[in-house]
């Protein structure tokens, strides 16, 4: 608990430092790819600081009519529960992984990136989720990738931008209730926009459920001295789901 409190204080300090963030434009050496190794905390750049560091607004979400009614009903149910101070059940309550692309931004939890020439490993502190990006390997046909929480990711460098192609996400793994089929493809473009500021542009494509691709961008700031905290959800997990699908907490008996 004390370690988590220190993390929260550190995240608050980082958030406040954004106000004074700015300086000259960032330039990257053309001789080699940028080094993304480090621990990165999500934040909303540009608040009182340099607006050029703020991620662009997401594109409009265009869900096909056959899936729209169910999507809107689920989002409305989520909003209604929140207005009552409640939460509807999701996989995380049972300690299931968030999966892709949700794992790239879980509240204020950081993501650690370990970069080598052939593989880039990303570790989300929440739930200790791990994904591996295989660099300069060909992507498999979607039907040849067993469905999983994180899918299969391959990457390549386009100048200073890491382009990642991910397929094979389980249909039950959704980002903000957006429906998808096994044909979904996720494309990421990760790029340093300043020495310690990283943008991850994420595009979700599924010609079955979406009329057009949906794109949003996450922003992170590097935390040079942070040590990742062990996260074991199953240990002392006291959350459960009642008959109405509402998340409840078991109160420990004295």
Region annotations inferred by a language model:
Residues 19-21:
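Low-complexity, intrinsically disordered segments with a bias for serine/threonine
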Residues 8-16:
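Sec-dependent signal peptide hydrophobic core
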Residues 2-3, 12, 23-254:
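PEST-like low-complexity, intrinsically disordered acidic/proline/serine-rich tracts
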